């Protein structure tokens, strides 16, 4: 079966056509990085306006690349939450219009579920059950995945998301947007042991995260020592990044050990970070039998192919959305 999916939850306008929930026939993304760079972050109004301009062109491009017309589609899936309400509305309205015009079933998809199942687009897909760590600009959450549509939240950030900590930290250091990419690049030239930052974790046995204190520690460091340049800036980036990565890895493997999971799926935009990917792989080697699934960086950032995977299985479960489908910016998985 073939699903057309539309994703507009934040600042990427995306459309994809996926066959049988495993093979992407087309995966088109129109990025807004250049639009938001001058502001140092995503401006919701600008994001929504650009989605209006780009949503139908990316759908047309996906159909063209896949060599598929409306008659070759079984259903349409769309991200209806969580995310920016104006951005979500553009995708939802486009999907409803196409479903009506083409007389196709419509399925709503939770954006976080899309990230959790993105690994099924890789050559080697995980088997259930597995732990899913979703790390992005708006979310840092740890889930137990028991099957498609069957997830249990184990822990989440109590304040800033990891991606937000990267972006705000980069802005504080005068680095360009997107900040996580800039920090990752500079950190490769730095010493992660140069500066000691506090652990960005919640004390105790729970699996929640907290990054606001780490961000404050970076601010105090810059106020005290000034903004470094050259090797000093690289060391600061590497040390700050290491503190974020250490918290993510520690909590994920604490959950694996406690709940006796031997599969971990890493997803979300921050999962494209080279140090995080390396640290997860390194820690996994310490656990006999532990399998780690790291989707390609393109599948970690927002895309519609992952929405199509989740949409395929929602469709097979008999889920359908009606003409009253609306954006749900706070939709919890």
From Swiss-Prot:
It is found in: Cytoplasm. Binds 1 Fe(2+) ion per subunit. InterPro entries: ATPase_NBD, Gcp-like_dom, KAE1/TsaD, Peptidase_M22_CS, TsaD. Fe cation binds at residues 111, 115, 302. It catalyses: L-threonylcarbamoyladenylate + adenosine(37) in tRNA = N(6)-L-threonylcarbamoyladenosine(37) in tRNA + AMP + H(+). Keywords: Acyltransferase, Cytoplasm, Iron, Metal-binding, Transferase, tRNA processing. One of its GO terms (molecular function) is N(6)-L-threonylcarbamoyladenine synthase activity. The keyword Transferase applies. GO terms for cellular component: cytoplasm. Its cofactor is Fe(2+). GO terms for biological process: tRNA threonylcarbamoyladenosine modification. Substrate binds at residues 134-138, 167, 180, 184, 273. The keyword Ribosomal protein does not apply. It holds the Pfam family TsaD. Its EC number is 2.3.1.234. Required for the formation of a threonylcarbamoyl group on adenosine at position 37 (t(6)A37) in tRNAs that read codons beginning with adenine. Is involved in the transfer of the threonylcarbamoyl moiety of threonylcarbamoyl-AMP (TC-AMP) to the N6 group of A37, together with TsaE and TsaB. TsaD likely plays a direct catalytic role in this reaction. Belongs to the KAE1 / TsaD family. This is tRNA N6-adenosine threonylcarbamoyltransferase. The gene is tsaD.
